[in-house]
Regions:
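Glycine-rich phosphate/pyrophosphate-handling loop used in enzymes and phosphotransfer proteins
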Residues: 1-163
Length: 163
């Protein structure tokens, strides 16, 4: 690390987006306490799980996995609200980096040839100005060393999954 980087971290310390505690030097996105409190999913395998079956009905994929269960009023829900509705794009990238790092730690990165974010409708993209799935995928891809490609086209508007 450069001296400038170290000075910047001293003057502008990074904080955990959940509890606002100052991140330790080894903590990249979330503090260890908050990361350990996320409702993790360790699926039985990436070749036979609910996520894969769900996606296969929409688009052919060989492998799929999910790291965190979505639950209303959980810290993870609060993070997604900040990303989607408070334009916290930096948080999206950081959360993606965390997820990608966890995938690498679990050895799941060896199965990934490409990460494909789910697209927004043109109207939603205009309203929001960014695709949070793309930002999450960019962070994951960077951590995993895997390219991100936009290969899907949104055909219809669905309902919000976070409300």
């Amino acid at each position: 690390m450069s001296i400038l980087h170290d000075i910047t971290r001293l003057l502008l310390p990074r904080r955990c987006p959940v509890c606002q505690r100052r991140l330790e030097y080894t903590e990249q996105s979330l503090c260890a306490v908050c990361a350990s409190c996320l409702p993790r999913l360790w699926l039985p395998g990436i070749d036979d799980n609910d996520m894969l079956r769900h996606l296969w009905t929409r688009v052919p994929v060989e492998h799929a996995f999910s790291l965190v269960a979505y639950r209303h009023n959980s810290p993870f829900h609060q993070l997604l609200m900040r990303i989607k509705y408070q334009s916290d794009t930096a948080l999206a990238y950081r959360l993606g980096w965390w997820a990608g790092s966890e995938a690498v730690r679990a050895g799941l990165d060896e199965y990934a040839d490409v990460l494909v974010p789910v697209p927004l409708t043109a109207r939603r993209l205009r309203e929001r100005g960014y695709n949070q799935a793309r930002l999450l995928a960019d962070g994951m891809g960077r951590a995993m060393g895997v390219p991100v490609m936009e290969l899907l086209v949104r055909q219809q508007q669905g309902t919000s999954q976070t409300h």
